[in-house]
Every structure is written in structure tokens, then in C-alpha cells.
Amino acid sequence: MIKLESLQDPSPRKRRTKLLGRGPSSGHGKTSCRGHKGDGSRSGYKRRFGYEGGGVPLYRRVPTRGFSHARFDKCVEEITTQRLNALFSEGEEITLEALKQKKAIDKRAIRVKVIVKGDLEKTFIWKDANVVLSQGVRNLIGVA
């Protein structure tokens, strides 16, 4: 039978702390619940996350999935007409190298596409095959 005075708070904050190394009758004496020898018995020991006691850990047992295209992806950038107006002067030739020099695109870029945002206020020379014009830009400059 449960009596009122025998009820205990089950939460860990009310539990009495384990006194370690206080003699054999305490139940936590001698090795202080650490066992004999091994990493866990040493001071300062913290088990590494994912450590499985020397066995092959899960992250090495599970096969790698899929394939990454990161090494083979072609870097294609885009640039707006508004940005071209700000970067280049009237009659200047727009090439991939010129855009890289002005740091308008990534240095790894192999191609750049010009898209419409605002009007083209200046006339530019378009000769580079790696600078592709969108249909909207073609309509702006009058090239079919």
C-alpha cells in the first residue's frame, strides 16, 4: 500500500547526488563507478560523438549515396542590362574577360548571359561568343 509519506518526486533535480569514492559500503567507492582501466577510467575523458567502442561507426558502415557534380559543373553567370550600364562606357566591347576584370562575374565563369532589367542606355560591341544575349536584350538592341 502506498502511503502519503512514501511518495517521492521522480524528477532528477530532487534526486540526491551520487557521492563517489566514499568507501565500499556507499556502493560508489574505490573506482567511483568508473570501472578498472580503460579510457573511461581516466580523468578528462570525454567520449567522441559517434564513437562505438572501437567498432566501425555507423557513418562509415552506411554507403555513400549519389554523385556530386560540383567538380564537373560549368559555371554560367548572369548579368543585367542595368549593371552593364553602370560598368561599361559608350561603345566599349563586352567580353567575358572584361567582365571578369571588372569583377562583375565569377572568375570561374565560362559563359555569361545578359538579361533585361531596365533599358540599355549605351551602345556596346557584342563580339564574344561566350556572352549570350537573352531574347529580351536582342529585342532592345534590335537584333532578331
From Swiss-Prot:
GO biological process, alphabetically ordered:
translation
Superkingdom of origin? Bacteria
- Tell me the keywords, alphabetical order: Ribonucleoprotein, Ribosomal protein, RNA-binding, rRNA-binding
Name the segments for region: Disordered: 1-48
Task: Give a GO cellular-component term.
Answer: cytosolic large ribosomal subunit
- One GO molecular function term? rRNA binding
Per the record, the similarity remark reads:
Belongs to the universal ribosomal protein uL15 family.
* Job of this protein: Binds to the 23S rRNA.
Q: How does it assemble?
A: Part of the 50S ribosomal subunit.
Record-given protein name: Large ribosomal subunit protein uL15
The primary gene name is rplO
